Amino acid sequence: MEPVEYQVILTAQAGQLFAEMKDRREQQLLLARLEKLKHEPEKQGKALSEELTGYRSIRAVGQRYRIIYQIVEDKVLVVVVGIGRRKEGDKRDVYTVTMRLLVDMMLESESDDE
């Protein structure tokens, strides 16, 4: 059986985080890592917990960057919600920024429903 190839998309926020990166070489390395997510994304990285349950994280560009994503099985889709440096304890830490963006997206979604 032919392996399934997932489509990898970035949320607007993840795309913006990627575009704001200054180092083009690091961007290229991140793109190469994103490309690998097309094949068996569920076997890559690690499952996250607590506020990010349902998401996975992989390391990129050595150990400095994290790509945070969610797999949508029924659509054969990988949705990247966060890209950035791991800076534990820093407000710009990729996990901190991603959680803030996800909360903002939920609040926007709720206000659209009203």
Language model features with spans:
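Short, charged helix-to-loop "capping" segments that act as catalytic/coupling loops
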Residues: 19-27, 50-52, 60-65, 85-89
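Charged/polar, solvent-exposed surface patches and flexible loops
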Residues: 16, 20, 32, 36, ...
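Amphipathic alpha-helical interface surfaces
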Residues: 26, 30-33, 44, 48, ...
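Enriched for short, Lys/Arg-rich terminal
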Residues: 7, 62-65, 70-114
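A short, surface-exposed loop/turn module that caps and links secondary-structure elements
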Residues: 35-60
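Generic secondary-structure transition motif, activating predominantly at the C-termini of alpha-helices
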Residues: 22-25, 38, 52, 56, ...
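Arg/Lys-rich, positively charged N-terminal/basic patches that mediate binding to nucleic acids
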Residues: 1-33, 107-114
